[in-house]
Amino acid sequence: MIDIHKNIYDNKLFEELKIDCKKCFGLCCVALYFSASDGFPIDKESGKPCINLQPDFKCSVHNSLMKRGFKGCTAYDCFGSGQKVAQVTYKGIDWMQSPELTNQMSEVFLIMRQLHEMLWYLKEASVLNISDTIKSKIDLIIEETEKITNMGPEQIINLDIISHRTKVNLLLSQASESVMGKVKSFIKTSTLKNMKKLSKNIDLIGADLR
């Protein structure tokens, strides 16, 4: 058996990437767009608060989202970007207190969500059974990405997110190839060993192997 994880899988790696709605300002309920054509019961524009969002940033129909047709809401994962934007980027200043920040905050949230998703996959890759060279590169880009998430709103908005994602995807591909190479090698070696064991006990002379 080959273990694809080289390092101990530490859940603490992902603590900051887990949803904590209590520390958020209902940003997913504001920033995201959805429509009836996508299976939702109503249309909602990006940057406009959902009609179900309450003044305390809680959902008034949270316990009946599925029944009311808001299935997408129950499946959405912001990877902890909501509380990051609320508590770190804007230091607790919400869009209800400062309506002029609503559009900017929504834009920052959508970018932050992408960055946090990248961090999730990078941290997943960092514990895989990969080469030390790739592991070092992944650790460096994790550090770089975390620094970006701590930047101010304007810097985050001006970030070349496509360029950064390209760098991340390249490393994730390298990590995947590294793991798959070891898995294929293990399977090949195991198969050969099993074939040798079988050959000692089976006489295939004259057998029809078509």
Protein language model features and the residues they cover:
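N-terminal, Lys/Arg-enriched amphipathic/low-complexity engagement segments
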Residues: M1-G26, A36
